[in-house]
Amino acid sequence: MKDSWNSTSIIPFTFSSLIFFLFTFDFQDVFGVPTKHLCRLEQRDALLELKKEFKIKKPCFDGLHPTTESWANNSDCCYWDGITCNDKSGEVLELDLSRSCLQSRFHSNSSLFTVLNLRFLTTLDLSYNYFSGQIPSCIENFSHLTTLDLSKNYFSGGIPSSIGNLSQLTFLDLSGNEFVGEMPFFGNMNQLTNLYVDSNDLTGIFPLSLLNLKHLSDLSLSRNQFTGTLPSNMSSLSNLEYFEAWGNAFTGTLPSSLFTIASLTSINLRNNQLNGTLEFGNISSPSTLTVLDISNNNFIGPIPKSISKFINLQDLDLSHLNTQGPVDFSIFTNLKSLQLLNLSHLNTTTTIDLNALFSSHLNSIYSMDLSGNHVSATTKISVADHHPTQLISQLYLSGCGITEFPELLRSQHKMTNLDISNNKIKGQVPGWLWTLPKLIFVDLSNNIFTGFERSTEHGLSLITKPSMQYLVGSNNNFTGKIPSFICALRSLITLDLSDNNLNGSIPPCMGNLKSTLSFLNLRQNRLGGGLPRSIFKSLRSLDVGHNQLVGKLPRSFIRLSALEVLNVENNRINDTFPFWLSSLKKLQVLVLRSNAFHGPIHHASFHTLRIINLSHNQFSGTLPANYFVNWNAMSSLMATEDRSQEKYMGDSFRYYHDSVVLMNKGLEMELVRILKIYTALDFSENKLEGEIPRSIGLLKELHVLNLSSNAFTGHIPSSMGNLRELESLDVSQNKLSGEIPQELGNLSYLAYMNFSHNQLGGLVPGGTQFRRQNCSSFKDNPGLYGSSLEEVCLDIHAPAPQQHEPPELEEEDREVFSWIAAAIGFGPGIAFGLTIRYILVFYKPDWFMHTFGHLQPSAHEKRLRRKQ
């Protein structure tokens, strides 16, 4: 019985002891299993306080993720997105908010820099957001930082000198902002290895304190306004691998000490004002240099023979070098790794023999640019010579004075890119060109070609899948119909045959290209018939202006969901206003000028339209007062916030840029490239009547407004005073009455205005812009008077001023604000408009990422890619 009692009493004792053991024993010490502690409460609270200062810009698109959405009060901050903690202490060590769609204006009291609860941060990454304002000096509180990345934001002001006190930093990226002034002293950051301050507005000379940074490996100063000479003792940076300072105003000679740095692999100093004789000095042996770009400077003299010592060179750009003599290509034969060679615009006095060059031993080169030099090429060669030593992939011969198509190219079966534009080549384009199996890009523009050889179609039949993607043949003398072989180029993305003498209709077989064709330019030909009804689902730009096209706009265009530019000007199209095009969510440019369009301009909400030209048609009727309420791209609702980065339409496409002709400041001007922030509205030379809609004042981003030669009546809306970006205003040749609104005198960008041939009266506004106009701008308005008018029209009659202005003018300001309120009150409509806004301004899809914009790769990202 005793034994039984003992056994039953031991069991509960042993179990309770085991529970106690499990809860108290530190298994981590035995098994080495890490357990993440809960984050510290004061740090969680600090992060939540920080979150309140951020606004998430929605929608958040590809490549961007709203990191702070996972931050919640009832969860462990160590598990939040963008947060890395110490596994033992729970201390927040890393804060990564990059690409998070965050917007905030920083100031001296911003929580991020003032809370001491995050003082042990080692990494702070705010890159690729929409942060603005100035960096406060208290950033030095983060004394443990090793990585600080503020790149690709909108930070302004000077770079705070206190950053130089962050002595533990190894990585600092301030690129892609709006910093101004001189760089502060960074000489105490002895651990720094990577420094990027490119793409700002920094001034002054080369920051000499940087020469103290002995561990520096990557240095980028590009795209600023630095001046003066580069230091002669650049060799102090003995660990430098990557040096970029292109796009500044550096002068003086190229410091030869650069080439004694044994670790240096990349130098880019293009687009400066460096001068003198090109010399490389004592080159380190063996040289590790792989990239050398010193193009677009003011160097003179021959290419130094010592360049042959750069035995690992892969990319060499010496373009725009004033060689003042012949080019000795033998100096490149020792560069066995050379792949890209740019010798364009050398100002050489001799002719480059392409045949001799192709017979040389530059076998590693796959891309060569000789544009802007005198180049000769034997056109008649034997079959035995069809196998040159040199096989090249990319050849650029633009503006080389070539008069016949180089026959030697027919054996270049590895060629992918051929630019032979801006020469004097006449006759027909040879059929064998299209048999080159890897050919992707051909530029034949600005020559004297008359047609394509008949053997072209036979040549294409020999290729299973033609690879051609870009065919540019503009500004030639091509005649006859559009060649049918083009329909067989089923990978074609860009087709430009503009400015030729082609006739006939657009072939229906071009529907074969509906899956790939993005840019079609056939303007300035003699094409007739109707527009194709095929659905080019990838079409982004269609320009068929200045032809003889008839009929109507195909209603199938409503399914061109990718369309951004539609230009049908100067044809014979007879149709009503295509209001249905407003459903195209990406349409930005619409040009219907000089056709036979007629009837009313129906009310339509063109949310994304930035340029519209309806001039020289037969449109009639009135425009309702709220006509422009939802034209968001021309209003501040979709205005780009990046004024410093002037981006053009088609920037992401190297081989094609949209253009448009507009009446601007009284002159017909061609915009060879279209700025993304440029906006214009031209309704001139029609039969429109009634009052000018007061909602015109909502278009605050408008640059050009032309309503001339219509039958508008009533007063000029005072709401036009809201058009803060307006540069050109033409309301001449109407029946307008009343005064010129005084508010127009406050428009500082308004350089041209025309009020002539109306029934205007009263005081002409003051202001510099009005005083700079010609007298003709006010002609045939006998009731106008004022000092501004007296200055531009010497002898005028000034009637007595009226005592009372019409009550309509007194109410206009209130009414335009009513339209603004109405616009804001449109609930779902405005949400839809804002969605389109962000698509246009902040969406960065793959096709938009090459140059783009504000989300271009930073210098250190490019560097990392090279290492991979």
Swiss-Prot record:
Extracellular topology ranges: 33-815
Pfam family name, one: LRR_8
SMART domains listed in its UniProt record: LRR_TYP (SM00369)
Signal sequence bounds: 1-32
Main location: membrane
Topological category with respect to the lipid bilayer: Single-pass type I membrane protein
Location(s) in or outside the cell: Cell membrane
Name under which the protein is recorded: Receptor-like protein 32
Gene: RLP32
